[in-house]
UniProtKB/Swiss-Prot annotation:
Major location (coarse): plastid
Domain KH type-2: 43-120
Protein name, per record: Small ribosomal subunit protein uS3c
Keyword Ribonucleoprotein appears in the UniProt entry: yes
Organism from which the protein derives: Chloranthus spicatus
Quaternary data: Part of the 30S ribosomal subunit.
Record family assignment: Belongs to the universal ribosomal protein uS3 family.
Length: 220
């Protein structure tokens, strides 16, 4: 059962919190969700185009959105703050990102504020690990080597366990298959176990590959 549902939704309210912190009337709730998706997509596209890769844990860990009547506060949790700020000076990158999101957003009543926070333990973030694997696969690095290195990163972060899965036409083979590796414990059916999860899609010259990562952080 543990692998058939999203591990984050399965533990929501127990060990996982919400990344969208706001409320709305039932009639306008769907519009609020679409708004969040637009903001996240705009941020991810901008970062992907402009980010400078200077280490193995560059990228977005997750995005948190808080809404008030007159303000939308967006907090971007990144592996390294400098990866976005180095584009064109210390603050130019954030200002340009804010302008781009504001254009997409089209709201006169709410102002937008974007902050960037550096995560304390980047090697324990499944999104950052998945982005690392995606970059390696695009460079035609062996998938086994990329998975092995990812597990080494997770061990540096003192995680209790990690499972990495890659599916699709791996290494350009005609028949799609699933390859996975696990190190340590990953108790997917234990609700009190804090497990971070990521599902990531990467386009390679051979086609689309799916990357899934489960990280067992702690037992509450």
């Amino acid at each position: 059962m543990g692998q058939k549902i999203n591990p984050l939704g399965f533990r929501l309210g127990a060990t996982q919190g919400h990344h969208s912190l706001w409320f709305a009337q039932p009639k306008s709730y769907s519009r609020g969700l679409q708004e969040d998706e637009k903001i996240k997509d705009c941020i991810k596209n901008y970062v992907q185009k402009n980010m400078r890769i200077s280490s193995d844990y560059e990228g977005i860990a997750h995005i948190e959105i808080k809404k008030r009547i007159d303000l939308i506060q967006v907090i971007i949790y990144m592996g390294s703050k400098n990866s976005l700020m180095l584009i064109e000076g210390p603050t130019r990158g954030i200002e340009e990102l804010q302008i781009n999101v504001q254009k997409e957003f089209h709201s006169a009543n709410q102002r937008l504020n974007i902050d960037i926070t550096e995560v304390a333990n980047p090697y324990g973030q499944p999104n950052l690990l998945a982005e690392y694997i995606a970059r390696q696969l695009k460079k035609r690095v062996s998938f086994r080597k990329a998975m092995k290195k990812t597990i080494e990163f997770a061990e540096q972060a003192d995680t209790k366990g990690i499972q990495v899965q890659i599916s699709g036409r791996i290494d350009g083979k005609e028949i799609a298959r699933v390859e996975w590796v696990r190190e340590g414990r990953v108790p997917l059916q234990t609700i009190r176990a804090k497990i971070d999860y990521c599902s990531y899609t990467v386009r390679t010259i051979h086609g689309v590959l799916g990357i899934k990562i489960w990280v067992f952080v702690d037992d509450k």
